[in-house]
Amino acid sequence: MTRTQILSALIAAAPLAGCAMPAPASAPPSSATAQEAFWQALSNHCGKAYAGGLASTDARDADWAGKRMVAHWAACDEARVAIAFHVADPEAAAGWNRSRTWIVTRSGEGAATRFTLKHDHRHADGEADAVTFYGGTSTDAGTARAQDFPVDGESVALFTREGLDASLTNVWRVAVDPAAQADARFVYQLTRRNDPTRLFRVEFDASTTITAPPAAWGW
């Protein structure tokens, strides 16, 4: 092969060699923060309803034992998820107490994202209860499946005014599995920092949907 032929072959092969070179290593995909994963897990239940019941055994909650309960993702948007909590009650209209709605909102971005849980309590006519819209805001990243909500100052003032001193150290927890998970659960829990014996916990089977109930009172 002449020098001219060799040079021509090298020039022709150059583009192919360039294509064959390994691509530069790309940065590994950034994983979702715990907050992003939690919000996604909570949000992907929107519109669904699940059956559940009392899972704790605190004697103070004896009147809740054995009652049918339903959690219904009644309203959702990019910054808010409202979950109606229905409790079977033979003394309530149509046999159900529909007075409670848990409202979780998000604020901030990325690792600075925080969540706030508020309790919307209504009477059967839709009017707000004297003790309503209490709750707290998460103080750390939490986990992809659970967030804790220590009682906030606004709620402390409300509880103090209403003589609910036992609630001044409330810590609520919301735990949720993604809707696609085979054994998915949804949990609402209450504990108190000054009372290690206090535990109120309701659990729902979030792997099996049920027919959505009527709207919560006032919604």
Residue ranges and their predicted role:
Residues 1-8:
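Bacterial N-terminal signal peptides that target proteins for export
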Residues 66-69, 95-101, 129, 169, ...:
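Short, surface-exposed coil-to-beta transition loops
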